[in-house]
Design a protein with these regions (language model features):
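Beta-strand-rich extracellular modules
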Residues: 166, 219-221, 314-318
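Short amphipathic, basic-aromatic surface patches that mediate peripheral association
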Residues: 159-175, 224-225, 266
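Post-HExxH zinc-binding segment in Zn-dependent metallohydrolases
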Residues: 66-100
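Non-catalytic, beta-strand-enriched accessory regions in extracellular/secretory proteins
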Residues: 132-160, 202-204, 215
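Short, compositionally biased serine/threonine- and acidic-rich segments at solvent-exposed termini, linkers
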Residues: 241-334
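Active-site-proximal segment of zinc-dependent metalloprotease catalytic domains
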Residues: 1-55, 75
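C-terminal edge strands of extracellular/lumenal beta-sandwich accessory domains
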Residues: 96-132, 149-151, 175-190, 206-244
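Short, solvent-exposed loop/turn segments in extracellular or other extracytoplasmic domains
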Residues: 147, 197-204, 292-299
Length: 334
């Protein structure tokens, strides 16, 4: 047993404790201790266990083990959440029947004399939106599953913009995090792009912004193994930008039989040190494909798959500033 608590003891008014035995958790594993603290706290504020049933309503797991593998694998806090990376409050069945569902968030915030904390950042896109500086480090929290946090950024000239959004966690690969982050980029009220990588809970952005005012909106999202119901919690935003010695990188492409022919043009004030074609199969997550010397301006490639291939060019100047081209999509013919 990793911990002990009484269901509903938070409201008894007599300081009844909940116990977590760290020497039995790992021993002393930060992930296991964090999960057990959350689990026993859940009992104290009125929650029962979360269970799993088959299609015929037969109980298969008294403690729901969750599902998935890797960084976005998921389990409910009130199940057995030790062995999945992402964990969260849940709205699902208890051991008392497949139709006996337990809305964790409603129970926690309506039966214990407290509710959600005050929102830290507004989601409105206007002059009052919190403004980012040219270099920033900000702590925020997605409080409810309808909460969004908006940040305004104004570029006075074309800039290379980098931002990392990291959910609060207790180890590598965001282990123990409760928040899977999605970021949306707006130009005024127009949604330009959504950053929601399928295989990771954090978001890393490298992009070029033309002069203008933009809004970055942070949201909790679901993934292949869970919904956005319990995708809540703290996060940190860090970022920086700077003027571009590389003014433009333009990538073009065509299909010749089954080969993809790529060509590009670079306009820059500084010499180019490295060039690298990157490939993606979803247009979001890119990986290196081939590197070239600074004078190369063309590349021919026979793709490994016959589906859609997305390409972009990553260019690094001699003063270590990075710029990316536009993204092009090509599909093998024939």
């Amino acid at each position: 047993v990793g911990g002990i608590s009484f269901i509903g003891s938070f409201t008894w008014g007599d300081d009844t404790p909940a116990f977590v035995f760290s020497d039995r958790l790992g021993p002393n594993s930060p992930k296991y201790i964090a999960e057990c603290c959350s689990h026993e706290s859940g009992h104290a504020v009125g929650l029962s266990h979360q269970s799993t049933y088959d299609n015929n309503c037969n109980l298969t797991e008294t403690y729901c083990m969750g599902s998935g593998s890797g960084e976005v694998s998921w389990a409910p806090i009130m199940g057995n959440s030790y062995y999945r990376n992402m964990t969260s409050w849940n709205d699902g069945p208890t051991p008392y029947g497949c139709a006996n569902t337990q809305d964790n968030l409603t129970i926690i915030t309506s039966q214990n004399g407290f509710t959600y904390r005050t929102d830290d950042f507004t989601e409105t896109l206007d002059a009052g939106t919190f403004a980012l500086s040219n270099s920033f480090s900000i702590d925020g929290i997605i409080t409810t599953n309808t909460d969004k946090d908006a940040f305004k950024y104004t570029a006075t000239q074309d800039v290379s913009f980098h931002m990392d959004a990291v959910p609060f966690n207790v180890g590598a690969n965001y282990i123990g995090a409760n928040l899977d982050i999605k970021i949306m980029l707006y130009n005024g009220s127009n949604l330009i792009r959504t950053y929601d990588p399928a295989a990771t809970m954090g978001v890393s952005i490298d992009t070029v912004l033309q002069a203008g005012t933009y809004y970055w909106v942070i949201d909790g999202t679901g993934n292949a193994y869970t919904t956005n119901y319990g995708s809540l919690g703290s996060y940190k935003l860090t970022g920086f930008n700077g003027p571009l010695p590389i003014h433009s990188v333009t990538l073009t492409g065509s299909t010749d039989r089954n080969r993809h022919a790529l060509g590009w043009e670079i306009v820059a004030d500084e010499p180019i040190r490295t060039q690298e074609i990157e490939i993606s199969y979803d247009g979001i997550i890119f990986k290196p494909l081939s590197a070239f010397n600074s004078s190369t301006r063309a590349f021919s490639y026979l793709p490994l798959n016959t589906g859609m291939n997305f390409y972009r060019l990553k260019v690094t100047s001699v003063i270590d500033q990075v710029a990316y081209s536009n993204i092009i999509a090509l599909k093998a013919s024939g």
